[in-house]
């Protein structure tokens, strides 16, 4: 499993995977690692293979595992993936054209939507790449989702994101105040990704005039050890210049 690589278009990182559990994310990335560069061909997994790829440790019956797999696609279908093309048309789509789970055969068969196979096929630039085993070893769903975004900027070692986008991308409850974001979101991220990537999280504040109260949290800068990729180009950074004043 150590050789399995997940690779997809950076556009996939713009989609928040709402209500996905840590196991849901592991299964989705395991599937993504195998359908990559297969075009729209059907790809079949045995349950045992999929469990191994996802690093699943708990014991589950075939029926339980089939329901877990089906839940992943239900959540994908509920998301309404969308992006804008060069003509600025807003296009919504389902990622998989076929997603067949068979408890009796103990198999999953999937095929990627033909119109949007570009997300997982023939990627030469502007893509996110990481090791599946490293991803599945993470425990927190917040750490997993942050990890994916950091890997988009693996050559620069910096991800800048506004508070608004951070909430959306990591599906942070709207009710969370900064103190709760620190405790329930950033703490597991720092605990797991700090040692792994030498991650440092810098909080960005909008300074107010004297006597106008405390500065407001407006974003984050995630700094980590960049990867060295021979002949590669660095990924673009997110511009926070309009909303962040250090």
Which role does the model predict for each range below?
Residues 1-246:
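Charged, alpha-helix-forming regions
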